[in-house]
Structure formats: structure tokens, C-alpha cells
Amino acid sequence: MRYLPVAALLLVAALAGCDSASDSASAARPEVSRPTPRYPDGQVRFDSEPGGRGYWGRASVSSLFEKGVQVAMDEKGLLANIADAPRVAPFQPWAVALYEYRQRNGLKDDPIRACIAPSGPRHLHTAGGFRIIRDPTYDRMYILFGGGNRNWRVVFMDGREPPNPEEVSGTYFGHQAGRWEGDTLVVESSGYNARFWFSNGGLPHTEALRLTERFSRPDFDTLKYEVTVDDPLTYTRPWTAEWTVDWVDGGEIAEQFCEDRRDGLGPSEPTSAGE
């Protein structure tokens, strides 16, 4: 079964009226915003409260483009007008040429088709949803993903600094160091390889990529996400993108594996837990 984007999964579930995780994601948001949940020590809680269930589901956009830019894309990150490609981000000349090639080629060289997991902000656009869990025992945050082969990210919260590229390199998820700035979780990552795509639509990057992500929860049902992309070999300057993600109350992140889908067709469709 072909991998379906989040928007398609939500539409199918809504039309069918089924009681699935995707259907929950399409449910109406509460008319009155609920307060941001917190741990007993006052720190923002990004996961469900004790005894509750839920996860972060649908993002407000389907791909990356620089903050303030207005471009039309479909759920896969394909531009409605290829002439808009140079406006998406401040590309170096070689990078915009590669981005346009990938767009014109219908994203056929997307590594996810060969079961190579996405990384960086693209994780937040994969079907299946995600959770952000605090681990005070080991002073870490874990970001668990239902899609993208059920990967997880480990964010070190023990005060360590992001390593230099010569110290850590060639990884898919990077070395991730986090800290709190008020109620905002700030995660700095580096040490990436260039074999994955960090966005739907095929934005290029090199091993010089550094990401600064900012997670905040202004109310119970909203996650605000901001990412600054810094890769001087690919872009002429650092640039920032942002979007929001909706909370799916009472659901569980979906199960999705890709081990048996190495035929170039892409991962199979995720299913709800227990199906």
C-alpha cells in the first residue's frame, strides 16, 4: 500500500467517519483554548498529562519555506509554480538548480522512497504524528515519531554545547543539545550527513548544516515550531521557517515501518495502534 501524506489520511478518515487517530486529528478544536499543561516544577509539558493520551498530529504547512514568503505547494512539497523556486529560500546557485531539478522530476529521487528516514523539520511533517517526552532521570528530551519508520530523537538537556562538525559528523539525526529559554525548548543540532532530505519538496543541504529549533506550547492544543537553517555551503545566509501543529486528544501515534518497502514505491501507509 502506498504511503499517503497527512492531508490525504485525514481526508480519507473524515469521509469514512472512522474512529481512527487520523480522524481524531481532523476533529474540531475546542472553542475555548485550554491552558498549557505543566509539570509540578512549572516546566511546560509537551506530552499528555498523567492518565491521558494524545500526540501532535497535523502541521499547518506541508513543507519548508522562508518566513514571510508566499508560495503554493501541495502536501508533498511540490510547487504549484516552478518559477517560485528561487523564492523558497536564499539558495546558493548550485542549490537552487538542484532544488528545481528535484521539483521538475516530481521528487522521484526522494531518499524516503528507499526507506531512508527523514530528519530535522521534515520529521514533523511525516504521517503518524509525534510525541515530546521529558526524561528528568537522564536529563534528556525524547521526540518519538509514528511515521518515518518510527524513529526517535534524543535531545541532551544536561548543559552540553553542540559539538563542532569535526567532533560529530555523518549522522542522520545530528547531535542535539537542548536548553530552556523561558517556556521555549531550544534545540541546536549539527553533525549531519547529506543523504537524507530535511524537508518535503527536496530542499538541499550539506554536512555543514546546523539547525536551531524552537518548540513552545502557547495553549493545550497548539505546538508552535520555528526552525533556523544555517548551511553556508547551500544558502547565502541563515533563514527561518515556522508553523504550528495541532494536538490530537485521546489518540496514540500510529505504527509505520518501511523495512519491507525497498522497491522504490516508498513506505507503506501508517495504521493506528492496535489495527
What do the predicted segments below correspond to?
Residues 6-16:
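Bacterial N-terminal signal peptides
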